[in-house]
């Protein structure tokens, strides 16, 4: 089969022929129809996170395709079913986090395209218990980004503890942020979009954001405190440490900041203001299997639609270069029919 393989951090991926995997007990083989390209994939090939993958490996964790082989003991899915291969490849199932419904915090988890080979290949091996069931009504290309970008922001919004009618800030209207705006509106929230690009803010407005702020020429905290009295929650998807710092000041008393983006560096936190204003700061990483299925179902219901551009696997290195330069609008999806 054809696959994009990374042999050395920071180098180009090589398109090469590798063996089609064989499923073991509890595993399935999925023939890819589509795979989203995520910023996490870029971190994987650069090797710039503290916990690194081990080359050679195949990145990718937003894969959609049809099951072609089923391993021993798999009974809830079958050959021909369309499934999604997401970031969470597997977890131990018996630690405190797994037993409490927080398998995304399992210290023994494996991750697609990082600790195990991922979806930048014509066939991918998956753990049958951790794939998402793709609703029949949706297109594989359009649904692929939900497997990471979608579930990540959906879970992040849930972590803000906001309720219908509350205000939520979405900071960073890129691949994740434009989906976050839609999920937030579907959840009954009022959206204030913050970015430094007028085109992205115009897009957020088109998607239904009630307030937009360009943080490049306006102090977003001062503006939002004046216009809406501060937000009940803020979800930061931007890859800028400054955005996290700014978001804290956009909250009203009792507000919650949820961190989704993963830029390098730190951001300052005023102990006095955090205590006095009852502010909560949370990190949120992807989502559980339940979060994944809920986010897929919301997209299938037409409440959320990623802006996607389809390209062939052979373009992967060029895609990563555009990603480095911030030149990608929405999400890029690998189309395995191209």
Swiss-Prot record:
Binding site for Zn(2+) 2: 92, 95, 98, 106
Keyword NAD: yes
The EC number(s) this enzyme carries: 1.1.1.1
pH-activity dependence text: Optimum pH is 7.4 and 6.0 for the oxidation of ethanol and reduction of acetone, respectively.
Pfam entry (one): ADH_zinc_N
Cofactor binding annotation: Binds 2 Zn(2+) ions per subunit. One metal ion is located at the active-site region and has been termed catalytic, while the second metal ion has been termed structural.
Temperature dependence: Is a very thermostable, cold-adapted enzyme. Is active from 10 to at least 53 degrees Celsius and unfolds at 89 degrees Celsius.
InterPro entries: ADH-like_C, ADH-like_N, ADH_Zn_CS, GroES-like_sf, NAD(P)-bd_dom_sf, PKS_ER
Top-rank lineage group of the source organism: Bacteria
Annotated catalysed reactions: a primary alcohol + NAD(+) = an aldehyde + NADH + H(+); a secondary alcohol + NAD(+) = a ketone + NADH + H(+); ethanol + NAD(+) = acetaldehyde + NADH + H(+); 1-propanol + NAD(+) = propanal + NADH + H(+)
Example GO molecular function: butanol dehydrogenase (NAD+) activity
Record key words, sorted: Metal-binding, NAD, Oxidoreductase, Zinc
Cofactor dependency: Zn(2+)
Binding site for Zn(2+) 1: 38, 61-62, 148
Quaternary state and interactors: Homotetramer.
Record family assignment: Belongs to the zinc-containing alcohol dehydrogenase family.
Function: Psychrophilic alcohol dehydrogenase that exhibits a wide range of substrate specificity, oxidizing mainly primary and secondary aliphatic alcohols, utilizing NAD(+) as a cosubstrate. In vitro, shows highest reaction rates for ethanol as a substrate and gradually decreases its reaction rates as the length and branching of the carbon chain of the alcohol substrates increase. To a lesser extent, is also able to reduce aldehydes and ketones. Do not catalyze the further oxidation of aldehydes to carboxylic acids. Cannot use NADP(+) instead of NAD(+).
Matches recorded under NCBIfam families: PRK09422.1
UniProt remark on domains: Each subunit comprises two distinct structural domains: the catalytic domain (residues 1-150 and 288-340/345) and the nucleotide-binding domain (residues 151-287).
Protein name, UniProt field: Alcohol dehydrogenase
Species: Moraxella sp. (strain TAE123)
Source taxonomy: Bacteria, Pseudomonadati, Pseudomonadota, Gammaproteobacteria, Moraxellales
